[in-house]
Amino acid sequence: MKSFTKILFSTLLLLAPIFSCKKSDVNKNFPTVPVNITIYLTTYPYTQLNSIGNHAYVSNAGYRGIVIYRKSLDEFAAFDRGCPYDPTATGSLLEADGSGLAMTDAKCGSKFSLYDGTVINGPATAPMKSY
């Protein structure tokens, strides 16, 4: 009986971390706007998207503009430039940092991965809004 209790306790102890993990919070307060854009990789400023790892901004789309990131030869990521921490804050706008691998909001200090939009650091807990 003691052996069974030990096994049960050990199993529960090992499974606890698995079930306690949660996905990043999704910002349900981020404004939802329709997006329907076409870009041409032969037209400036989108020509920089011909190289993997580069990004380009699209003005007048999304809530605060969109950043497009070239992940691979046939895969792109598109995110809103509004900071998920407080998307309606005046002056809040995500800008690419010097590495070109992350976006930072100068107002709140949150930093996000351009590859997948996840939070790197800062007060934000929700990832960048993806399109």
List each language-model region with its residue ranges.
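Sec-dependent bacterial lipoprotein signal peptides
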Residues: 1-21
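N-terminal pre-ligand scaffold of iron-sulfur
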Residues: 24-99, 113-114, 129-131
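Short loop/turn microsegments at loop-to-beta-strand junctions
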Residues: 74, 107-108
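Short cysteine-rich clusters marking metal-coordination/redox-active sites
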Residues: 83, 104-105
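Short Fe-S-cluster ligation motifs
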Residues: 109-131
